[in-house]
Amino acid sequence: MSTARFIKCVTVGDGAVGKTCMLISYTSNTFPTDYVPTVFDNFSANVVVDGSTVNLGLWDTAGQEDYNRLRPLSYRGADVFLLAFSLISKASYENIYKKWIPELRHYAHNVPVVLVGTKLDLRDDKQFLIDHPGATPISTSQGEELKKMIGAVTYIECSSKTQQNVKAVFDAAIKVALRPPKPKRKPCKRRTCAFL
């Protein structure tokens, strides 16, 4: 009997985008109603994907700037990153390429990224958008465009509250970690010799 392969999956993104809620929703099928910054403990579970058992280790990180020095310590040994932004926050969307991709490429440049748009249930919630005039909905096409811009392997939108696509996020992360994309090879420059 072979031992299960361990996959370290690290969630990254701005504070309050829903990283912890997504992890709690996935691991316990419940949605926390109160916002408590980064209270999720590291979690490990055996998961069967495509007939193979993997031990999935989930690591939560704090997005707040107070943790800029500590957060990268959790990146070591990561097999895949879940890079999250809120589908109702333009600032969190822009920080994907302004802050998070530069940080991930600096500390873990070869680790694949799954881009995740969270709070899908609120994007089309007219009452929420009326009550929160600062909320700016991000479209699916904007998410796909961002995926291409940052070189993410895939893009998934989810709602931790309704659990829509939450399992799909983690299934994608596992599949990406098991079969990471081949790095793009740079074309070789042909060297020419000139005999004089």
Curated annotation (Swiss-Prot):
GO terms for molecular function: GTP binding; GTPase activity; protein kinase binding. It holds the Pfam family Ras. The modification Cysteine methyl ester is found at C193. One of its GO terms (cellular component) is cytoskeleton. It is found in: Cytoplasm; Membrane. Residues 194-196 form a propeptide. It comes from the Eukaryota. The keyword Transit peptide does not apply. It is a peripheral membrane protein. Keywords: Cytoplasm, GTP-binding, Lipoprotein, Membrane, Methylation, Nucleotide-binding, Prenylation. One of its GO terms (biological process) is actin filament organization. Could participate in a signal transduction pathway that controls cytoskeletal organization. Inactive GDP-bound Rho GTPases reside in the cytosol, are found in a complex with Rho GDP-dissociation inhibitors (Rho GDIs), and are released from the GDI protein in order to translocate to membranes upon activation. This is Rac-like GTP-binding protein RAC13. It comes from Gossypium hirsutum. The gene is RAC13.
